[in-house]
Every structure is written in C-alpha cells, then in structure tokens.
Amino acid sequence: TGAQLLYGGDAVIAVDAHSNEMVNGLNESGKLPVKVVYKGTANSSKEVEAVFKAANNDEKCIGVITWMHTFSPAKMWIHGLQQLKKPLLHLHTQFNKEIPWDTMDMDFMNLNQSAHGDREFGHICTRMRIRRKVVVGYWKDEDTQHKIAVWMRVCAGWADSQDMLIIRFGDQMNNVAVTDGDKVEAEQRMGYHVDYCPASELM
C-alpha cells in the first residue's frame, strides 16, 4: 500500500488498518485462487525498494499488487519499479464505497486520496513503460475480484514456467543459430528451458 508521512502517524496507522481489512476481505471472499499477503505500508523510496526486493527473492510470491490509499509521491516508486521482476497489478480502488458528504473534513480528504495517488502511480508506471495489469473498481465488488483472480491465474502460469523444462525430440541441429536462437529467446523471455534429445531416446 502506498502512502506518505506528510499527514502524520495517525494517517499511516489508519492506512495500515484499512489495508489489513481489505486484504482479509479479499482472501475471505472465496473469489481469489491465490492468497494475498499484506506487506505493510510503504512511505518512502527505501521502503518501496525493500518490499519489491523481498518479492523478487520470495519463491512463493507470484506477483505484486499495489494500491495507493492516500497520495503517494510517485518518484519514490522509481527505484523499486526498476528492480521488480515479478508481475505487477495496480488496483485502482478506494477503501470506502460511498463518500460521507455530511461528515467529510480535511482529515478524511487527506487520508482518502486514492483517486489522486493511483493517478500519480499510473503516471510513473506509464512514464517508465512498466508492464502491468490495471484493475479499476471497488475492492468488494465481485467484478473487481474476478479481474484480480484472472490475473492471479496468469501469474501462476508464469511462475510455473520459470523453471519449466521442455524436451524436443529429433531437433533440427543444422543451422544451429536459428534453432538454438529460438531456445535462448524462449528461456530469456518466458523462462522455458528447452533441451534436445535424439529420436532414439524414444525407442
């Protein structure tokens, strides 16, 4: 979850509580095939970088979901995004479904700036040409949860492919630059390790 310290410690505590509630709600919805694990609120460039590095190094992590509860200055996301190797989903939502017009004050407005923060995050991702899935909608809505679930299944397939071994029998070994060039590209782009076995191995 993205935030910042500008609005004080109470705001950060509220962001943390709301984020936990959202993650628990998503996991308890029964709509998601993979468990979402909350990794805390990132309030600085170093904290963002630490979260993304941890995601890269965690074999159980198949993707990262980001959400900006309040305004999170996007320059602090640059170094983390440059290092992220896992699939990324940007969840453009807000904690409250309805705006409390009768009771809304500046504290509420400072705390709940998803529209501002998510737009800022979307800008830096586009500026950096970061490949990502963007899901827009209220986090409790089934349609939103369905879109997250579809992305999760794609991530699961991607994660499985990272250590996949493919055997090609009777491979074409003439003009190796072409055939092995495709194998190199398959491993570089998709994680598929392709080996050759002669057709006699099938006998």
Per-range role (PLM):
Residues T1-M203:
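Metallocofactor- and cofactor-centric catalytic cores in central/energy metabolism, strongly enriched
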